[in-house]
UniProtKB/Swiss-Prot annotation:
Subcellular location: Cytoplasm
Primary location: cytoplasm
Catalytic activity: glycyl-tRNA(Ala) + H2O = tRNA(Ala) + glycine + H(+); a D-aminoacyl-tRNA + H2O = a tRNA + a D-alpha-amino acid + H(+)
Originating gene: dtd
PANTHER family: D-AMINOACYL-TRNA DEACYLASE 1, D-TYROSYL-TRNA TYR DEACYLASE
Pfam families associated with the record: Tyr_Deacylase
Entry remark concerning the domains of this protein: A Gly-cisPro motif from one monomer fits into the active site of the other monomer to allow specific chiral rejection of L-amino acids.
Family: Belongs to the DTD family.
EC number in record: 3.1.1.96
Disulfide bonds: none
Record carries keyword Transmembrane: no
Signal peptide: none
Protein name listed in UniProt: D-aminoacyl-tRNA deacylase
Amino acid sequence: MKVVLQRVSEASVDVVNELGTLDPTFEPQQIGPGFMILVGVTDGDGDKQIAWLAHKILNLRVFEDAQGKMNRSIQDIGGEILSISQFTLFADVHKGNRPSFIKAGKPEHADLMWIKFNEALRSGGVPVKEGRFGAHMRVGLVNDGPVTIVIDTEHDMPDGTR
């Protein structure tokens, strides 16, 4: 799994239908202070990656304490998460000018892993709002910092836990 995590003061998502207008079947989602997370899944991802990544995100100390030092987690500040499924995080641009997405997980697997990941975050007591898997979305956010962190379980998880 790969995530791009951004600390935000607010973020929102809505879904656009094939006519280019807002999809009335999707209720726009918005959060206040917390994280907007783009989430990419590969076919090799499973419960171990989900558990490790959710724990890492829930405990990541990137919010300032009273002294202005990054020393507080999203749980500490009572923050929220906006989770957006994003297969393009696994784009391969080595050859030609059109990215290849063959490293991204198959939709059925990726959707299930994304759902499980969001539930793992919720189990940490943090409210999680979601976009819609596979949809054309408009995501808005106000970066706080900015603080942007990329976490890739393939490279960042300790070897014994993969």
